[in-house]
């Protein structure tokens, strides 16, 4: 729980242009729903500057909540892995969330990315993310369930439209780079079961 009057510092990690757009969109949108958050997105200037390690280290140290914007193209990106590793060392698992764009599933992730709570950029998953952030605010900063629902329902349509654009950009990037996803084990098992059922029907 945060100290009285303290805003929650949310570190949003990205790598690649579609992921950066997603991070910036979340940075701008989150305070519309929960005013007691202070989202941070690292800029290209920080990443390429001579003092990047010191500056990033300070931001990561002060972070209360971490969000990764993951796409099929950035799962092995050095920046994502560095920031994910630093966040996972500092924060408990419930305070770490990955937003999976471009058809990603948990089966596509390896450590440290697999340590995060994984959500899709869908309405109910984003609602759960907002609810989790709200639960970890200082008591006097927390919104009631009714307030949270009101603010979320008001601002969700704006985010939804931007997510559609991001999804198109992610799919275009994935296609241009020839990235292929792992198949979800559950999906493979379902396919095997369906094939087995069809075989049994043919034998009957």
Where do the protein language model's features map onto the residues?
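Amphipathic helical hotspot of TIR/SEFIR-family domains
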Residues: 62-104
């Amino acid at each position: 729980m945060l100290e009285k009057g303290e805003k929650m510092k949310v570190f949003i990690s990205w790598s690649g242009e579609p992921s950066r757009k997603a991070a910036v969109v979340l940075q701008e949108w989150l305070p519309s729903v929960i005013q007691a958050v202070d989202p941070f997105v690292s800029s290209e200037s920080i990443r390429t500057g001579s003092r990047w390690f010191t500056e990033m280290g300070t931001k990561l140290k002060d972070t209360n909540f971490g969000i990764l914007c993951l796409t099929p193209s950035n799962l092995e990106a050095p920046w994502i892995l560095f920031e994910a590793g630093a966040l996972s060392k500092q924060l408990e698992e419930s305070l770490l969330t990955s937003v999976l764009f471009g058809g990603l599933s948990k089966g596509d992730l390896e450590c440290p990315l697999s340590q995060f709570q994984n959500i899709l950029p869908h309405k109910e998953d984003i609602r759960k993310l907002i609810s989790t952030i709200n639960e970890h605010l200082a008591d006097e900063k927390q919104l009631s369930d009714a307030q949270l629902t009101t603010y979320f329902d008001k601002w969700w349509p704006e985010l939804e439209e931007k997510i559609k654009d991001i999804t198109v950009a992610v799919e275009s990037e994935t296609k241009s780079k020839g990235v292929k996803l792992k198949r979800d084990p559950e999906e493979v098992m379902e396919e095997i079961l369906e094939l087995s059922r069809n075989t049994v029907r043919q034998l009957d």
